[in-house]
Amino acid sequence: MSAGWFRRRFLPGGPLPEPRPAGPRSSPVPYHRPRFLRGSGSSPGATDASRRPDARPVRSPARGRTLPWNAGYAEVINAEKSEFNEDQAACGKLCIRRCEFGIEEDQEWLTVCPEEFLTGHYWALFDGHGGPAAAILAANTLHSCLRRQLEAVVEGMIAPQPPMHLSGRCVCPSDPQFVEEKGIQAEDLVIGALENAFQECDDVIGRELEASGQVGGCTALVAVFLQGKLYVANAGDSRAILVRRHEIRQLSSEFTPETERQRIQQLAFTYPELLAGEFTRLEFPRRLKGDDLGQKVLFRDHHMRGWSYKRVEKSDLKYPLIHGQGRQARLLGTLAVSRGLGDHQLRVLDTDIQLKPFLLSIPQVTVLDVHQLAVQEEDVVVMATDGLWDVLSNEQVALLVRSFLTGNQKDDPHRFSELAKMLIHNTQGKDNGATGEGQVSYDDVSVFVIPLHSQAQEGSGH
């Protein structure tokens, strides 16, 4: 990102439109739940009684409707935090077409995959905020963006080594050596495709929400299986973990104002105009008061992992760029995440200060080589929005997973959806012997449970 581009994009006089006056606004997409929940019984709405923390109905796919790999899914709406369930989910088969160099093909989404195509699978969770629109758009769009990005690099993915020139030309005899020295492999092309797909999807959401005068954003957690590897891409505070008999491995990191403090402070240091004189970029252990003026107090800036002391000046009394701790930390007093999709129109309350310049849509991607795992029958990946992780730790989830799968009917294709439902029940305040006193999550909760064993020995299709 160049400084010139950034200034044109975000600083005064840039292309972001001013907030529109209040009035009736039509959503760019109708509200709906994931398509694979059709026929599951419960309607999207819920009565007041069913929105109580301990009485909210948990939804999962109807029996007879299976997801890729017999993966399990379950969800529950929030306890009257918002009118709608702002989470969304998507899953399906990815069909990546190989094409001859120079042939331009249409962009229609394919549902039938001839054997000569590279195929994979896709699971995604989107946790919306400021309304459900951004999450719905992401669920409808991101897989198509990813397919296009993968098709742009598929010839490099299937080559023994990605060529310097996709056309196959060798302009410089040392080109293969340069690629080898950089350590570029097929998985790097998949990672790049995921990063570009997130950015493309973010642009689409921005255009759609701007056209309808809407605001809103969402986090995105995606798992993609291609060529024997599982790619987990995360932008936000959802989480994925691998649960095995004797191992728990976290496959994603949460991106919050706290975890990305230095990046956010660096941006405010480079472009102080973004704070409009209303915020201080410095971090202090607590919000400073007038009595702190002239005193030396603990602080840290963008270049610091540790702490030091400074004498408090009047400008230090402004509201902090990042305020609060843990789940309560907020960026510009507004947003609890630092990465995600959307939020192009989001401003600090009663100001023209934009949050989008501080947000990244680019995910962190973790690669799990499934074929190198010696996968056992009860090995699963659990993906969930933050409503689950607010009340259950990785260890508690792993304990529940192992307890459920031991002795449960192994030939039941819906047992992983039952497992996902059980995990959600453990966020509804019900005491469970495995986890102790039941805690309550008032948030929307969505969970995928992806079994690895059935695919561990299966090669990717071409």
Swiss-Prot record:
Mn(2+) 2 binds at D127. Its EC number is 3.1.3.16. One of its GO terms (cellular component) is nucleus. It holds the Pfam family PP2C. It comes from Mus musculus (Mouse). It catalyses: O-phospho-L-seryl-[protein] + H2O = L-seryl-[protein] + phosphate; O-phospho-L-threonyl-[protein] + H2O = L-threonyl-[protein] + phosphate. Residues 1-10 have a biased composition (Basic residues). Binds 2 magnesium or manganese ions per subunit. It is an enzyme of class 3 (hydrolase). This is Protein phosphatase 1M. Residues 100-452 form the PPM-type phosphatase domain. Keywords: Hydrolase, Magnesium, Manganese, Metal-binding, Nucleus, Protein phosphatase. InterPro entries: PP2C (IPR015655), PPM-type-like_dom_sf (IPR036457), PPM-type_phosphatase-like_dom (IPR001932). One of its GO terms (biological process) is protein dephosphorylation. GO terms for molecular function: manganese ion binding; phosphoprotein phosphatase activity; protein serine/threonine phosphatase activity. The keyword Cell membrane does not apply.
